[in-house]
């Protein structure tokens, strides 16, 4: 709970600045790249969150990371601020909160679409279009693959779940036949 409220404060502060400067989308993209870099490297994650490393060591690594990712000054400053306050572990939550604020600001919804096999671009676009029609908003897809679905897709937009999987259809058929 505490991590969430602290992450929200950092995200809201950076988001307010992004809105002022008209940089919501570029900063959102940069923060996603930063989050992926940190989550994709266990060694980097360890250095950034482990108190065994001095603030100076972490600061040097954060500077190299910001430079390598070509971060603009404000997102880089967020990284430095989190590092200076020993809160780099909050970075994923800050980025996720910023992303949610950006989506809301830009009138977008995120949908998690799970399919039995990877979706090609055309199928993904068709699903996004259908979900956009149903929700009356621009829908961005986060795709996942789960072979247990057997076929079809399951789409989740907020608290709504559209289940068109073969697995669910077979389960429904089995229940009907048992009656």
Curated annotation (Swiss-Prot):
It holds the Pfam family OSCP. One of its GO terms (cellular component) is plasma membrane. It comes from the Bacteria. Keywords: ATP synthesis, Cell inner membrane, Cell membrane, CF(1), Hydrogen ion transport, Ion transport, Membrane, Transport. PANTHER family: ATP SYNTHASE DELTA CHAIN. Belongs to the ATPase delta chain family. This is ATP synthase subunit delta.
């Amino acid at each position: 709970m505490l991590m969430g409220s602290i992450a929200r404060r950092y995200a809201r502060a950076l988001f307010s600045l992004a809105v002022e400067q008209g940089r919501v989308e570029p900063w959102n993209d940069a923060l996603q790249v930063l989050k992926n870099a940190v989550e994709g490297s266990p060694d980097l994650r360890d250095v950034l969150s482990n108190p065994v490393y001095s603030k100076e060591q972490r600061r040097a690594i954060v500077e190299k990371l910001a430079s390598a990712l070509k971060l603009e000054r404000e997102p880089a400053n967020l990284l430095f601020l989190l590092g200076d306050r020993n809160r780099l572990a909050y970075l994923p939550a800050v980025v996720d909160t910023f992303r949610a604020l950006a989506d809301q600001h830009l009138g977008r919804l995120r949908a998690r679409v799970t399919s039995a096999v990877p979706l090609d671009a055309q199928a993904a676009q068709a699903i996004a279009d259908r979900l956009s029609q149903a929700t009356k908003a621009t829908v961005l897809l986060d795709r996942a693959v789960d072979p247990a679905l057997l076929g079809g897709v399951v789409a989740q937009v907020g608290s709504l779940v559209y289940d068109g999987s073969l697995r669910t259809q077979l389960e429904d058929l089995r229940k009907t036949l048992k009656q």
